[in-house]
Amino acid sequence: MESIQTEREDKFDVDADFQLPTLASLVPTGGALVSSETDLSSEYFDTAGHDLLRRGITLRRRTGDSDNGWHAKVPAEKARTEIRLPLGNGANNAVPDELNDVLRGAVMGAELSAVATLTTRRTIHTVSDADGAVVAEVADDEVSVVLIGGATGPQWREVEVELGPAGSESFLKKAGK
């Protein structure tokens, strides 16, 4: 079964030696800050002509954390609409029919296939309010790319601040400073 949600996040490209500042000032009164690390693998899909990339759409199959599954992200003003399906949808890593149907217009009938695999070492800091609701997740990612065919792609580091159900635009502004 698919789920659809709106995703609101800000991303920051940072240098390899960047030191994430303390996040204690972002924790609401009575809230908590919990940190963990994980390794992610995300296989990205597109057409031979990169139709999704040209439209700002991403399609991936992710493993390695609680966000496992198929994710199609479609741009919208200040946010993205994210369509999620479980890993079981899509035999042998093939794009699930449900996502092929949703993206058919964007790819104009072209075949979707794997184009790259991103490996991410993620340190995630979850900020919760006094009731335990997630305000935001701050992810510090070290990313490397392998293109289909085995060529090594770029490596980079980025910090992502994604609002949770209890988050607000003011949190993003404060976190971005």
Predicted regions and their residues:
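Phosphate-end processing signature that detects enzymes handling 5′-triphosphorylated RNA
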Residues: M1-K177
